[in-house]
Amino acid sequence: MKKTFFQQYILPAALLLATGLTSCKKLIEIPANPPTEIVQSQQFADSATAMTAVVLVYSYVAQQTGSGFGYNDAKLPESTGLSSDELIYTSPNIPDMTAFSGYGLTNLNSVVGQLWTSPYASLYPINAVIEGVNASNGLSAGFKKQITAEMQVARALYYFNLVNLFGGVPLSLSTDYNVTEKLARASVDSIYGQILSDLTSAQQNLSADYPSSGHIRPNQAVATALLSRVYLYRQQWQQAYDAANTVIASGSYSLPSDPNQVFLDGSTEAIWQLPATSLYYVTQEAHDFTPQFGAAPNYIINTWLLDAFEPGDIRTQDWLGQTVVNGDTLYYPYKYKNIQAGSPTIEDYMILRLAEQYLIRAEASAELGNGAAALADINVVRARAGLPASTANPASQTAVLNAIMHERQVELFTEWGHRWYDLKRTGMAAAVLTAEKTGWNANAALYPIPILQLQDDVNLKQNPGY
């Protein structure tokens, strides 16, 4: 019998999670004796077998995950941190990483290839679950809505990153190879249209309660929080404000007073987290950013980011590590601190957190003409960092927006590509990166389509400049 996608790739991952990774909490309950073979026609016959398929998808996603949700090997925080003004790469181990800093990317770059293929590898099983549960005659309408909504949130997040890295990309919503084999690039507007469709549908069908322990499987707030980000990027200011306000006003989340508590399992700030599943280290970020055995860090904080922190900002103590190499003090990202698996302190990958919602509501308020409300929101984030209230003039929209961008820079650094995306969406990239770095040109705002994808799909067209 020919193995299904789940049998061949996802089930072994789930079994590994269930039996071998005792240091990681379970994503959702895995049956005591999970099946070793799932026939395609039986995968969604009832809620038990359907949940097995869902477990497999989450297991697969978690095994790939860096803070970029399925971008572990692709190094999303690292590559976008180098493309922006956050990081400097010091190691000779991955030559293709250096190209991100000097805007020398080509369609042969292996990291760019992973940035493309990693999300599409996860989109296939996500689409398979959506199709499977909705085609089943053995599942209740409520169950179908719940699982479909969870998968829609995951799909929306993948496409959000794809469209911000590459621009228009193939929009694959099916598992039918005849449909997906030669897809052309959908427009940016079409991609965002699908993202909004998925998230608004999910928001309507998810409960306020999380469907499992922890903040792993999405609830309604997860869909709403991601919607607020998407609305912000689309300059739909009132919708962005309303969505962020809904999450903040719910009272379900709070900012820990200690920044060191933010990225821990069960953080009160966490809207959506996934557990790390590596056998050898806790999170990809801790592994990549934290120096070991007295060596220099592979990635150090760029001077421009270091200088952006104000005196007295405790984030420099809690979220920046430092080491002395050859007499030079080097700083590195230290939001995730645990290097070795089995650490007594569990850190989870943070996907969505409350501080971003405050900053989204602040920016939306500023764009809507309410500078005082905007400053009140960024001051909440500043207070946690041990800083006084912003001195920006609330009557000056430019001053308020600059204050918000500054706060996003020092609060969200090396998370999710926020800085890279912010520079591009606000039109600041040329001015900031031309002043700070060499080699910048407008074409560098989008990464090249990988050569293998162009060879496999004749309908794909390369981005300008590559």
Residue ranges and their predicted role:
Residues 51, 59, 92-165, 204-207, ...:
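Conserved, well-structured interaction surfaces
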Residues 40, 68-91, 208-286, 390-398:
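Short, surface-exposed recognition loops and adjoining beta-strand edges that mediate ligand/DNA contacts
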Residues 24-76, 244, 390, 431-466:
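Membrane-proximal, proline-rich intrinsically disordered regions
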Residues 98, 241-354, 411, 444-459, ...:
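Hydrophobic-face positions in mid-chain alpha helices that act as interaction patches
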Residues 23-24, 283-285, 299, 310, ...:
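Long, intrinsically disordered, low-complexity segments
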